[in-house]
Amino acid sequence: MKAFVSVLGMDKKGIIKEVASVLSEKDINILDINQTIVDNYFTMVMHVDLSDITIELGALKSALNKTGEQLHLKIRVQHEAIFTAMHTI
């Protein structure tokens, strides 16, 4: 299964490292990454492969929410089909 991880918030050092570390610890492969900083506002979308995930999806969402709270960010995980449907005109 593939999914998208979206990260939003004020820019600071270490955001990509912290999010990637959580994913790596759970054996999740990052397929693609796009990040932008506009007027100190950080946005990132990661396309990830959950084929080898070592925990339940709900537990992954909780782990990323905890990281988001620590960094004052919003982090969301969405199944690829849902993300694609939401972003198709």
Question: Regions from the language model: what does each represent?
Answer:
Residues 1-89:
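A conserved regulatory-domain signal marking ACT and ACT-like small-molecule sensing domains
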